[in-house]
Amino acid sequence: MTAIAPVITIDGPSGAGKGTLCKAMAEALQWHLLDSGAIYRVLALAALHHHVDVASEDALVPLASHLDVRFVSTNGNLEVILEGEDVSGEIRTQEVANAASQVAAFPRVREALLRRQRAFRELPGLIADGRDMGTVVFPDAPVKIFLDASSEERAHRRMLQLQEKGFSVNFERLLAEIKERDDRDRNRAVAPLVPASDALVLDSTTLSIEQVIEKALQYARQKLALA
């Protein structure tokens, strides 16, 4: 009988620290990593590379079904590998973002990408970063964590990130955008942003990233009986 690879799902709102936590856990456990938030951008970029019409659901479905993508975390840096090429920077362009919002609107594309995401489940295990990993994509995952933080703290973190890149930021506007996105994500009809009933809700508002990583790893190892 083939062993089923364990999955640790990390869900939560934007700015809670999911990406940093997932990279740290994947490196600590030497497990595979899935950044579900990047999947639609990767598909959009693949479509642009292969001259596939991003407005054609029929053309996109086979591309989504066989998307050749890997996520590799090295020293805290995430590399997105599409067809053997590092596209970490390329998927962040506005052209790709616009195309990603188009491809994400197609139900059959979303279904194909759901199956593709589940295919990341390989031994020794998978860390899945997203918003509906524990509720929709891997409902049977043995370890589910919902990482949260206050909207004010998430806005503050985002402001610091943008300021470090040289951008001028209005905190109140940033906070309003985050609250609006939270409201939209939590109240949408399909896969709303809610903790799975069996998830550990971890509030990172007053914790350092090191404390968050320590708590999450301790919980995961306890649930999985890992040394």
From Swiss-Prot:
Give an example GO cellular component term for this record.
cytosol
Residues in a coiled coil are none
List GO molecular-function terms, semicolon-separated: ATP binding; CMP kinase activity; dCMP kinase activity
Query: Which residue pairs form cystines in this protein?
Result: none
Query: According to the lineage, what is the superkingdom?
Result: Bacteria
TM spans (from-to)? none
Residues annotated to bind ATP: G12, P13, S14, G15, A16, G17, K18, G19, T20
CDD domains in UniProt: CMPK
Q: Recorded E.C. number(s)? A: 2.7.4.25
InterPro entries per UniProt: Cytidylate_kin, Cytidylate_kinase_dom, P-loop_NTPase
Q: Where in the cell is it found?
A: Cytoplasm
Q: Which UniProt keywords apply?
A: ATP-binding, Cytoplasm, Kinase, Nucleotide-binding, Transferase
Q: Which family does it belong to?
A: Belongs to the cytidylate kinase family. Type 1 subfamily.
Q: What is this protein called?
A: Cytidylate kinase
